[in-house]
Amino acid sequence: MAPKNKFTKEEMVEAALRVVREKGMEGLSAKSMASALGTSTQPDFTAFGSMAGIKQAVYDAAVRVYDSYTEKGLREQIPFFGVGIQYIRFAREEPALYRLLFLTQKQVPSYGAMDAMLHLQERVRPTLVQIYRITPEEADVYFRDLWLVVHSLATLIVTGDCPYSDREIGSILTGFSLSICKAIKEVPGFAAGTFDPDAVFRALVGK
């Protein structure tokens, strides 16, 4: 039997990540990894325990790639808007990894699309409170609602069905941002969900 090639864990994870970017997690196998590593022999998975172990390592690597995008957004002058733009950029530039993390059944019980949203919500809450002069509870509602729009746009991008340019997406996000902020500021009980939507709409259409 031919000896198995020796590669570092980092080299194997990078090779596996290349496979996933091209073929998705379902395309990851010993054969596809060998091809990505440029060898004709099966890689030695001892360091990972099994193929399941390397799949977990690839998932963790995908999370790190995603985190690098959101960290850039958090360093922008307006962090919560920067995070939204970077989230969409991640979907556009890393569609396979976006699909793995956010459009498939959870690989890790504590990490999925909603978990990612809650983590970012916590990070941007202080900035929202400071800039918009709203309460932490109102800031959470604002970010949640805007994030749902961002996630929808990102999903359209990944599925190849988004007709909007980056400029148009920026305008869409600005419009929703303004609408949500105005509702929080001017509709009593909006953030708490205790307002009367029928009364609010009647007042709006009656103007």
Descriptions of predicted regions:
Residues 56, 60-83, 120-131:
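Amphipathic alpha-helical linker/stalk segments
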Residues 108-133, 140-145, 151, 155, ...:
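Amphipathic alpha-helical packing segments from all-alpha helical-bundle domains
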Residues 11, 15, 19-53, 57:
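Helix-turn-helix
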Residues 29, 99-102, 110, 159, ...:
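Short, hydrophobic secondary-structure boundary micro-motifs
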Residues 81-103, 110-117, 147-154:
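Helical hydrophobic small-molecule/effector-binding pocket
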Residues 126-130, 163-207:
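C-terminal peripheral helix-coil segments that are non-catalytic and often amphipathic
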Residues 20, 52-62, 70, 101, ...:
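Alpha-helical DNA-contacting segments of helix-turn-helix folds
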